[in-house]
């Protein structure tokens, strides 16, 4: 192997190691989401509808996602702060955690949905 080939090979290995290290650091950590992304707003709308389905009184209406984070795991966890209103009550803020296994298949699970006091 020539010196030039060895240097190129070493540089390529270094680049791969840096990229792999950067990717590994982000897996599992929470990162902000763009609340203006239509997909994020759809996840918030879905979370409210899913929660409303399980509540006897019902009447919860999605307003908007105001903040959020995502966590890449075997799929993606979304922790969303959202506003919703209910019939006969004042508007409220809620935190919803939605697990989305694959955005293309709409395989979702509402992990939690809690009012923010």
UniProtKB/Swiss-Prot annotation:
GO terms for cellular component: extracellular region. Disulfide bonds: none annotated. Belongs to the cystatin family. Phytocystatin subfamily. GO terms for biological process: defense response. Its main location: secreted. Specific inhibitor of cysteine proteinases. Probably involved in the regulation of endogenous processes and in defense against pests and pathogens. This is Putative cysteine proteinase inhibitor 7. A motif (Secondary area of contact) lies at residues 71-75. Transmembrane segments: none annotated. The keyword Transcription regulation does not apply. Residues 28-84 form the Cystatin domain. One of its GO terms (molecular function) is cysteine-type endopeptidase inhibitor activity. InterPro entries: Cystatin, Cystatin_dom, Cystatin_sf, Prot_inh_cystat_CS. Keywords: Plant defense, Protease inhibitor, Secreted, Signal, Thiol protease inhibitor. The record marks 28 as: Reactive site. Residues 1-24 form the signal peptide. The lineage of its organism: Eukaryota, Viridiplantae, Streptophyta, Embryophyta, Tracheophyta. It is found in: Secreted.
């Amino acid at each position: 192997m020539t010196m030039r080939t060895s240097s190129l090979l070493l540089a390529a290995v270094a680049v791969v190691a840096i990229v792999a290290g950067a990717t590994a650091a982000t897996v599992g950590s929470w990162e902000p989401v763009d609340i203006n992304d239509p997909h994020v707003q759809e996840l918030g709308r879905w979370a409210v509808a899913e929660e409303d389905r399980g509540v006897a009184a019902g009447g919860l209406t999605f307003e908007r996602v105001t903040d959020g984070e995502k966590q890449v795991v075997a799929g993606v966890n979304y922790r969303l702060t959202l506003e919703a209103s209910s019939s006969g009550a004042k508007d409220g803020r809620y935190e919803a955690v939605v697990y989305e296994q694959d955005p293309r298949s709409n395989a979702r699970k509402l992990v939690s949905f809690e009012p923010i006091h």
